[in-house]
Amino acid sequence: MNTFAQAQFMTDVNGRPVKELKYTDIDGSPYLREDWSAGLIKTQSGKLQQFARVRYDAFQDELEYDQAGKYFRLAPEISEFSCGDGTFRNGFPVIDNHTKDSFYQILYDGKTKVLKKIMIRVITEKAYGSATETKRFLKEEKLYLAINGILQAIKGDKKAIILIFQDKKEALETFIKNQKLKLSSEDDLLKVAEKYDSL
């Protein structure tokens, strides 16, 4: 048990013990969205299962479901899930501090994939002139491109993004110029990925 969570042992759908984590002394929420929503999960074997109430714990990078008022963590055999926050998938190459089990939100799902990694971490703060420390959850997001089985982090400037698409650089530069894309928004990036797949 860590210093900021109390664990209760429960059983998941496969009969294995799992921990329901209750964060007691941290401000904010570990969930991407506090509300529950209907969800659909896909296992590694391709089996689909629907749940009436799920939510994504981005701090633990796990999906939680509610069954008759009891909370359960879904087993690691899950490869994909969809809920009110979008569609999330794992199985991508290891990058940064993320593993093959890490879930990414799928923003564009063509031959090229645009992914968003949503991370929630705990930070400790001390108010000026105070000896008291407080902990709170902080949400961070990072965009990635998956091209030909390679995962690459997306940096904010146009030149760095064009370098990722180097094999079709000239056509994309023309497209970006004609469309007046600044590549500073997710929408612009999705348009470029879609164009890349069409070339």
What spans do the regions from the language model cover?
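Positively charged
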Residues: 6-44, 50
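Bacterial Sec-dependent N-terminal signal peptides
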Residues: 1-9, 192
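Short, solvent-exposed mixed-charge patches
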Residues: 198-199
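Short acidic/polar alpha-helix capping motifs at helix-coil junctions
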Residues: 2-5, 26, 136-139
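Aromatic-patch recognition
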Residues: 30-32, 39-153
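A short, solvent-exposed beta-edge/loop patch
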Residues: 122-191
